[in-house]
A protein has these predicted regions:
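Gly/Ser/Thr-rich phosphate-binding loop
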Residues: 1-3, 12-127, 140, 223-224
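Amphipathic alpha-helical transducer elements in NTP-driven molecular machines
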Residues: 6-9, 27, 31, 178, ...
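Alpha-helix/helix-capping structural signal
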Residues: 7, 89-90, 155
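Glycine-rich phosphate/pyrophosphate-binding beta-alpha loops
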Residues: 88, 157, 210
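Active-site glycine-centered loops adjacent to acidic/histidine catalytic or metal-binding residues
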Residues: 88, 111, 133, 180, ...
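Conserved ATP-binding/catalytic segment of the ANL
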Residues: 135-202
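C-terminal boundary motif of the adenylate-forming
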Residues: 181, 186, 220-226
Length: 226
């Protein structure tokens, strides 16, 4: 497995796009054709819990990999990676889908130091792009009235050393305030929208999530950071 923050995966995707741009017109057409054929295969694979939806999809992916994808995975140094993991910030679903198309499943995870690193993780059968997966064992979750994710469980830390005031600020009735605004799906998967402190509130009282705009901008190979 390979674990990286969103910026690592974004830079790898951009390095492929830059490399393709420097190839011959014929090679670019081959790449574009393979990506077009590979996208629905990856989408069906995601909808099927991470498994190929049919033998036809498996065979077609093998052909596309032979023609194009294997060389791209080798270029990135991930040809032997069975699964990747992405966490630490929000990430565009298009970035994750890019690697699924290449044949490297990238699973989103969520957590923080105060929750012992990981509290949510995608896994086969729970692979919705843009979601951080269901909870790990014995951890509970709920949201506050303003949408902040709250966690409770044996893996949650007890408090900050020698700082009772800081500890009191992040706990409420044994629930840890993560500082992240989320949507929780019926399946239990968490969709992290943004940091609570980064949410913009308009004069009309509407909440705007900057990360959605930032991730859309970063899908462009011409924009490094937004």
């Amino acid at each position: 497995g390979f674990l990286g923050v969103p910026r690592i995966w974004e830079k790898m995707q951009q390095s492929v796009l830059y490399r393709v741009k420097d190839t011959t017109p014929f090679q670019r057409r081959v790449y574009e054709a393979c990506m077009r054929r590979g996208r629905p295969i990856a989408e069906r694979r995601l909808a099927n819990g991470g498994q190929f939806a049919s033998m036809g999809d498996r065979l077609m992916f093998g052909l596309l990999s032979l023609i194009c994808f294997r060389s791209l995975r080798t270029f990135l140094g991930i040809n032997r990676v069975r699964a990747g993991f992405c966490g630490g910030a929000t990430v565009s679903p298009e970035v994750l889908l890019f690697f699924w198309i290449l044949g490297v499943p990238v699973y989103q995870i969520y957590g923080m130091t105060e929750s012992a690193g990981v509290s949510h993780t995608q896994r086969p059968g729970a692979t919705t792009l843009g979601r951080s997966g269901p909870l790990i064992a014995e951890v509970e979750q709920k949201t506050s009235p303003d949408g902040e994710l709250l966690l409770r469980g044996p893996s949650i830390f007890k408090g900050y050393l020698f700082d009772e005031a800081a500890t009191a600020r992040v706990f409420s009735d044994s629930w840890l305030h993560t500082g992240d605004i989320v949507d929780i799906e019926a399946s239990g998967e968490a969709h992290v929208l943004d940091r609570k402190k980064d949410i913009l509130i308009t004069s009309g009282g509407k909440n705007i999530t900057p990360s959605l705009i930032e991730n859309a901008l970063k899908d462009s190979p011409y924009i490094r950071e937004a």
